[in-house]
């Protein structure tokens, strides 16, 4: 691995480590997303805590955290594998941020950015899948999980297995991060889209 590739991966991780949910809630003088609602510093919890505007800002920044480094890797290296690894590092930064004690969000919005940066078709697959599942079930977590796996496995059909591997690793990490959501989905206790923040309970 040359210096350029290494630098891009480090940049992706550090950018991913900037937790926009925590920063946005601080700017809007809202409770910390780590102590209210689900306790998850992500877009869905910010929506429950502060409404549409703070959530939209959080969503946009989280998407850009994935999009920007992947596009940079794509343009500067022209290497699909390095670009896919850049996506993985951006997700790792978001989920395990060095600036916030390695306790971050669940990576969905940042994944959307990486997918659009890697291939707009993959990004579109994610968005369409998420919307379809969300409209039918109103479960944000279920929509995210289904869309994540469909989009990640779709990489296999557009690139070789080596390139797809980082996205499959991302899917597994996101699945593990949603363990609590999966348990509540099974028990029928998972929060639905539109539910207001209550006591901290680890939902998405």
Curated annotation (Swiss-Prot):
Pfam families according to UniProt: G3P_acyltransf
Alphabetized NCBIfam families for the sequence: glycerol-3-phosphate 1-O-acyltransferase PlsY
Pathway note: Lipid metabolism; phospholipid metabolism
Keyword Iron: no
Membrane association type: Multi-pass membrane protein
PANTHER family linked: GLYCEROL-3-PHOSPHATE ACYLTRANSFERASE-RELATED, INNER MEMBRANE PROTEIN YGIH
Task of the protein: Catalyzes the transfer of an acyl group from acyl-phosphate (acyl-PO(4)) to glycerol-3-phosphate (G3P) to form lysophosphatidic acid (LPA). This enzyme utilizes acyl-phosphate as fatty acyl donor, but not acyl-CoA or acyl-ACP.
A GO CC term assigned to this protein in UniProt: plasma membrane
Name by which UniProt lists this protein: Glycerol-3-phosphate acyltransferase
Biological source species: Francisella tularensis subsp. mediasiatica (strain FSC147)
EC top class, as a word: transferase
Record-stated family: Belongs to the PlsY family.
Keywords: Cell inner membrane, Cell membrane, Lipid biosynthesis, Lipid metabolism, Membrane, Phospholipid biosynthesis, Phospholipid metabolism, Transferase, Transmembrane, Transmembrane helix
High-level lineage: Bacteria, Pseudomonadati, Pseudomonadota, Gammaproteobacteria, Thiotrichales
